[in-house]
Structure formats: structure tokens, C-alpha cells
Amino acid sequence: MAEKELKDALDKLVVELETIDQSDAGSRTMLKQLVELIELKLNEPGNKEHHDQLLDKLKGETVHFEVKHPLISRTLEEIVAILVRLGI
């Protein structure tokens, strides 16, 4: 169940990525990297290295997006909560 929630949140994040202005290349790059890390988690659920890297990056990037992109920040917080429920 939580893995489906994670997939849904990832889909939402991909849609939100398209709302970031093209001139904000830094934010777009950060978000693309987060999406890739989440996809790695979904594809390799047993890989602890990906899990640790993902959580650290998510927590840090949530703050970055909080002011300019609050919807993205909330989605990232949702993903962190899902990962915690998954025991990651």
C-alpha cells in the first residue's frame, strides 16, 4: 500500500516538475535528481545505500523548495513520510 502511495507521489512530483520555470534550471535539476533517486528506490527496494541517500537528499531539498515551490515541498514531505512508514 505505501509503495503505491510512493508511486503516486512520484507521479505528482513529475507533474509538478513541469510547473517550474525553465529559467530556474537549478531547481529543475535538483527535482529531476530526486525523481531519479525515488525511482531507484522503487526499482531496488532492498538497496540500503539508495534509501539513505534518498532520505538525506529529500530532507535537504524540501527546505530549498519551501519558499519558491510550496506544493513541491509538501509533496517531498509526503514522500519522506511514506518512506518512514516503509521503514526506510
What function would you assign to each model-found segment?
Residues 1-60:
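Short amphipathic alpha-helical segments that predominantly mediate membrane engagement
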